[in-house]
Amino acid sequence: MRPMRIFVNDDRHVMAKHSSVYPTQEELEAVQNMVSHTERALKAVSDWIDEQEKGNSELSEAENMDTPPDDESKEGAGEQKAEHMTRTLRGVMRVGLVAKGLLLKGDLDLELVLLCKEKPTTALLDKVADNLAIQLTTVTEDKYEILQSVDDAAIVIKNTKEPPLSLTIHLTSPVVREEMEKVLAGETLSVNDPPDVLDRQKCLAALASLRHAKWFQARANGLKSCVIVIRVLRDLCTRVPTWGPLRGWPLELLCEKSIGTANRPMGAGEALRRVLECLASGIVMPDGSGIYDPCEKEATDAIGHLDRQQREDITQSAQHALRLAAFGQLHKVLGMDPLPSKMPKKPKNENPVDYTVQIPPSTTYAITPMKRPMEEDGEEKSPSKKKKKIQKKEEKAEPPQAMNALMRLNQLKPGLQYKLISQTGPVHAPIFTMSVEVDGSTFEASGPSKKTAKLHVAVKVLQDMGLPTGAEGRDSSKGEDSAEESDGKPAVVAPPPVVEAVSNPSSVFPSDATTEQGPILTKHGKNPVMELNEKRRGLKYELISETGGSHDKRFVMEVEVDGQKFQGAGSNKKVAKAYAALAALEKLFPDAPLALEANKKKRAPVPVRGGPKFAAKPHNPGFGMGGPMHNEAPPPPNIRGRGRGGNIRGRGRGRGFGGTNHGGGYMNAGAGYGSYGYSSNSATAGYSQFYSNGGHYGNAGGGGSGGGGGSSSYSSYYQGDSYNSPVPPKHAGKKPLHGGQQKPSYSSGYQSHQGQQQPYNQSQYSSYGTPQGKQKGYGHGQGSYSSYSNSYNSPGGGGGSDYSYDSKFNYSGSGGRSGGNSYGSSGSSYNTGSHGGYGAGSGGSSSYQGKQGGYSSQSNYSSPGSSQSYSGPASSYQSSQGGYSRNTEHSMNYQYR
């Protein structure tokens, strides 16, 4: 884990201090030699004493214990263990600084513990010391001086060369502690101690040091930064007398407690600050919590030996040190000069120093382990566990992933500052330009994200330096899709040379670089899985393989199309499926046209898109009005059947919003509901051709269903929800007459363009609807045919539109839905001026008899071209543009649910 940025400077100072106090390699080798020589000599002394004791017993017994047979069974092993337990000297252990790896420069005092079967005595100490001198001469040529310290229950060995090391061997026995516990429990001891037994407290201290070493190796050695911080603080305890009482076991416990309770691994600087915070909080104060000793059965305070003044001094010193660290003066706490802000890069050491383990463990005097070794090839293991273990080994054996250009550059030039120069492009496809200054030269590059732009900059810098960019090792062969993707991106940096797309795209797996470029699309800009599904339904994608660790998964998916199998790989199953589908498309449909092959039914011509957004010709745009319904307009290339009227495709039940007169709704060019089986593919494929009058359908200009438009429009009672079905080709040549340049169109619903053109608003149809000024109501269009209430009886908006579902669907509106269907019994008489309204070219009452029922509407209105008003009492009006909804291509809006 990367260290936190705010502690980077502290980390540098702590590590620099640590390097200065860490022993040199020569010192560590001298310690290693002295310890290993002593261990081997003590092993020889143990053997010698054991032989002497066995010599007093029977020879056969000695043979059984000394030379077990080769085909020794577990029973034999148990005998050997028992024989080991009966030895006078049971083993030698490393303790203190040597065992914990806390040696610093100048630490010359080393410690070992010699475990005895019985309580150690002065006689035993003399015997061991005498024979140790003899055995050392056989083990090594180095000269050692051996001293006996009966008061300390120890033997001291000193070397005669530099550095002058001193090794103390403490004699002790577990029996000492066992007897002490019995005494504390109130038991009486039946065995009397020999008169020359060594000091019990010294023996107990040696046993405690053994427990401390084991605990430290189990808890602190594996804790990141813990050993480093302890070494640095040991140096602080030496330099600052106030900290002296903490040196040793209390300091080790304090550091483990402070660092081990953090919720994440910490760098050396942050870990040191956490220890200072722990001390500054008053943990060692008399009323503080103290430091619990985990190696004692009874609750023991490891700092119980400190007096009140020492505790206060340590706390005050820690608080001062913490303030210095907070103000960036940690170097004063460490007793060193401040480091420059930019450290020179040290050459990489081929043999990095392992700061955790200073001296390798001993194998000389190894006691039979209490735990049996793990059997690697044990047959009792379950096959699944074996398989997982093999997979893990294989994963570890795999070479690490090659570094990308950014990582490589950061290794060569650490601390580079990347700057965002600009961000251009639309919101959905931004282009970021990043720059970096290296050795006085500035490099810039762009990309679809800041991360990619930084990567491109790094590639540029490495290429300028003549160094590998890290991309060469990747798969150089890319499919056409990835090539086109890269073409669509801004070409900023010349990437490494890429081999042209191979002929078999199914074998091409995209590199990681292409997956960062964005979504995987076909050359038609679609999702490959979706496009392949349009061509071949019901395909099944199967997972072939899953490799890599949890952080770097690799999936391979396979799909079978027309008997051929195609594979794709990616960092997740979705990406792998996309590449498999892409490979199939490239191979099987290399030249597939953009238009969908699924909808090949014959469609009638469809008008161009209209409305305020797509006004192709000068006409008054309006929501729901649609564009000019001229049948000569070619159909758009890719019409979808369900849509928000105005756009080519959409979702939602045909809200004819701002729609072109093909409506985009259910009646697209005769392929509306007709293509779904609701009605035939006729021009009036609306709701069962609801007003396609057989007689008047094809009249010139204003004929049949909607004057020149010929397309039926069904408007539901939501705003602009019109369903328009464009006209058949036979009307293509018959342009309805109209006034001005307005191409006739007809309203399909919500007319919100009142300000632009309101040929007849509510006031004009005041006799049929409520006077509503500029009401933008539902279906309010021309003259407020806002009654979306054909299925309700809503006289308010439509002048009493009485709609009854009889066999004939008699729509007898006394206002013709007030402009909505502006024909009605003596009601909506209007003149469309240049273009006659609905119905036959000759006036009179026209009854539209659709296949599903006739709308009997007495629409007395003039023929196209005549500017006379309809026979209506109140609401006759003249409109040169005529048009039932601002353009005179009338779509008769029947709003019934």
Curated annotation (Swiss-Prot):
Q: Where is the composition biased (Basic and acidic residues)?
A: 74-85, 372-383, 472-481
User: Which residue stretches does the UniProt record annotate as biased composition, category Acidic residues?
Assistant: 60-73
Glycyl lysine isopeptide (Lys-Gly) (interchain with G-Cter in SUMO1), cross-linked positions:
K348
Q: How is this protein named in the record?
A: Interleukin enhancer-binding factor 3
CDD domains in the cross-refs: DSRM_ILF3_rpt1 (cd19910), DSRM_ILF3_rpt2 (cd19912)
Which residues get modified to N6-acetyllysine? Answer: K100, K460
Question: Position(s) of the covalent cross-link Glycyl lysine isopeptide (Lys-Gly) (interchain with G-Cter in SUMO2)?
Answer: K396, K489
Annotated region (Interaction with PRMT1), positions in chain: 609-897
